[in-house]
Amino acid sequence: MSNVNMDFEQAGELKIGQVGIATLRIRTLNVPRLIQEMSDRVTRAPKLFRRTAVILDFGELPHTPDLTTAKALVEGLRAANVLPVAIAYGTNEIDLLSQQLGLPLLSKFRAHYERQEVAAPPPQSTPPINTGRIQHTTVRSGQQLYAEHCDLTILNTVGAGAEVIADGNIHIYGTLRGRAMAGARGNAEMRIFCRDFQAELIAIAGRYKVLDDIPTELRGKAVQVWLEQNQIKIAALD
């Protein structure tokens, strides 16, 4: 089994959401660097990222950006054809910043911040994965197929522009030309298995790679995709 390491540092970590809205987790207030990274992503994969909606998450920064910096970031992202539509819930300073920028505060992130202020409750077990869903026919361009709480097995082709999503693993016995996203609810143990790998995008628990990030020697091969230390790994199946 050949293994390809594609680790790289990012100024902003982009995670693909379950409903197509990505979260841009800001890791630096170096605005030119952030804008350049996002511009490069749009250039490499315009069909995926041009005019894509993103939620800005400042939660990993040591302090909340000032209004001037935040405005420069929002304006720069828009100029790069990336559209900030909301800010992730955070501190009172984040609340004020969202009002000043005219962007809504997304409450789905509220629990994450409140857990940091109170004792964590006993961990709850992950809902069990149910019997898998099987798709016999081709998933065509523009179609989206979602397997909730289970694995997804596709016995045919996933066309370019099509999207297949599963909370569990994804098995594709034909050609993958579109997008495949496993572990959609955040389970990083899930994998993607594909007989003919020509994907536009692959993602495990929100971490993703696009076509231009995938080594050419793996295209057209039978591969498996998994997550290791928050990085996507791809290996040919012997």
UniProtKB/Swiss-Prot annotation:
Annotated signal sequence is none
UniProt-listed Pfam families: MinC_C, MinC_N
Which keywords does this chain's UniProt record carry?
Cell cycle, Cell division, Septation
The organism sits in which domain of life? Answer: Bacteria
- Which BP terms does GO give this entry? cell morphogenesis; division septum assembly; regulation of cell division; regulation of cell septum assembly
What InterPro entries does the record tag this protein with? CAP/MinC_C (IPR016098), MinC (IPR013033), MinC_C_sf (IPR036145), MinC_N (IPR007874), Septum_form_inhib_MinC_C (IPR005526)
For this chain, the annotated S-S bridges are: none
Q: Is the keyword Lipid metabolism assigned to this protein? A: no
Coiled-coil intervals, chain numbering: none
Task: Name the SUPFAM superfamilies for this protein.
Answer: Cell-division inhibitor MinC, C-terminal domain (SSF63848)
**NCBIfam families, per database record:** minC
Oligomer and partners: Interacts with MinD and FtsZ.
In UniProt terms, what function does this protein have?
Cell division inhibitor that blocks the formation of polar Z ring septums. Rapidly oscillates between the poles of the cell to destabilize FtsZ filaments that have formed before they mature into polar Z rings. Prevents FtsZ polymerization.
The family classification in the record reads: Belongs to the MinC family.
Q: What is this protein called?
A: Probable septum site-determining protein MinC
Tell me the organism. Xylella fastidiosa (strain 9a5c)
Recite the lineage of the species. Bacteria, Pseudomonadati, Pseudomonadota, Gammaproteobacteria, Lysobacterales
Task: Report the gene name.
Answer: minC
